[in-house]
Amino acid sequence: MSFVLGIDTSNYTTSCALLDTADMSVRSCKKLLPVKQGERGLRQSDAVFHHTKQLPELMKQLFDKRYDLSAVGYSYAPRCAEGSYMPCFLVGENVAQAVSLACGADLEKTSHQVGHILAALYSCGKLDMLSSDKPFAAFHVSGGTTDLLLCEPDKAKLINITQIGGSRD
């Protein structure tokens, strides 16, 4: 029995989860980043600070005992696109790399956007769509943007994403 740790440190939420590969069950912990009343979001430096404080607390909740980790995954950027970068994702990346090295677990990176799509497929019992030849459409609503995405299963990257529509916000 092995487990996969997932970490996401977006500009809104600190998240971590454990996937039990034996039964595909998931335990997760998450905490919103504090935004002062009347403000619309956080500066990246503030998001990094809050993730640095919150992630160890959440990992302590998640790891109620010792787990045999086979892999550690993390979000490295908002999207899998040239120039897609936010410093807040460095916190999750650094923790994921440290845990991976300490446990001898594989290290896997993906985008925040792909993470949302995978979470949606998991929660509706449709992970089998990843092993199909058929493309599918997905809406990604996150961080003040709404995107209509064409998702094509890919053995190497899991999903190739092409934005085919979206909001102008």
Regions found by a protein language model. Name each.
Residues 1-169:
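Short acidic/glycine-rich loops and adjacent helix/strand connectors
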